[in-house]
């Protein structure tokens, strides 16, 4: 995990120096081989999240300037979403293929954490097999293309800040890879995050135009939010994000595959439902992660 963050910070600094703390070293303690460390430049945290105009301009600059070393989507090493392993140590020509694999991995981790919820699992299959190809394959077909951009991988309020000394925005706690730039914004959809303020998305779009087809930007954003919200469901016991993901999957299936959705719908109870944690509690526990 430490090596993944070290390589993420190294990649971010390679594109935009000072947009992330410079990494110095990582390793394990001789006296405790199961304990690892990461040594980076110290940056004093100020306002969180940073000013939307400055921050989104720098983020868009990162996405525009970054160049995948293979021209493909992926990364040269596995990185992590908090403490959850991501499928990043591969290279794919198709963004749809990589995102499908990444979301499928998060679904498997959710099953391991909470147990299989049959109704939810059926929705997951429909999203993986139908919705993802429908929404993401058009990005790279009929003459359209998207560039593999270096993404931070987990941009929420507490992983962004204004540097007290310079007044400039910076990011940290990265789990990077080369993906669709719009994936980065999927984490801003959740109302529990201050980055969900429309100023951030609006200013980002001014710096990095929407991918074609533009009229499906919001649908893609909802699709990308699923992976982040599933991560929250796994990391924070008792939160309501599993239910939120189910509802958002249902919305996507209703919009694009209504007949298939009706064919699989049924009343299947969710095992161990604990969905009464507040947004404040979620933020506190995310911060601990």
Short names for language-model regions:
Residues 113-116, 196-198, 213, 274-277:
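Anionic ligand-binding catalytic core segments
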């Amino acid at each position: 995990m430490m090596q993944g963050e070290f390589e993420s910070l190294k990649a971010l600094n390679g594109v935009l120096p000072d947009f992330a703390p410079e990494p110095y070293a990582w390793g394990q303690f001789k006296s405790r081989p199961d304990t690892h460390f990461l040594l980076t430049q110290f940056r004093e945290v100020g306002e969180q999240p940073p000013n939307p105009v400055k921050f989104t301009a720098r983020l868009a600059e990162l996405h525009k300037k970054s160049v995948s070393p293979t021209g493909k989507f992926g990364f040269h090493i596995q990185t992590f979403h908090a403490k959850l392993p991501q499928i990043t140590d591969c290279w794919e020509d198709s963004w749809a293929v990589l995102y499908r694999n990444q979301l499928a991995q998060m679904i498997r981790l959710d099953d391991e954490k909470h147990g299989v919820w049959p109704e939810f699992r059926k929705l997951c299959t429909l999203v993986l097999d139908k919705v993802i190809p429908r929404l993401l394959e058009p990005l790279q077909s009929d003459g359209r293309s998207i560039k593999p951009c270096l993404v931070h991988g987990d941009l929420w309020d507490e992983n962004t800040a204004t540097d007290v000394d310079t007044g400039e925005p910076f990011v940290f706690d990265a789990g990077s890879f080369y993906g669709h730039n719009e994936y980065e914004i999927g984490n801003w959809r959740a109302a529990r995050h201050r980055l969900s303020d429309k100023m951030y998305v609006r200013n980002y779009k001014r710096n990095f135009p929407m991918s074609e087809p533009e009229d499906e930007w919001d649908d893609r954003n909802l699709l990308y939010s699923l992976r982040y919200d599933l991560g929250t469901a796994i990391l924070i016991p008792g939160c309501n994000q599993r239910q939120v993901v189910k509802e958002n999957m249902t919305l996507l299936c209703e919009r694009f595959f209504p007949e298939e959705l009706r064919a699989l719908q049924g009343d299947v109870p969710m095992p161990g439902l604990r969905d009464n944690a507040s947004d404040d509690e979620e933020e506190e526990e995310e911060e601990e992660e």
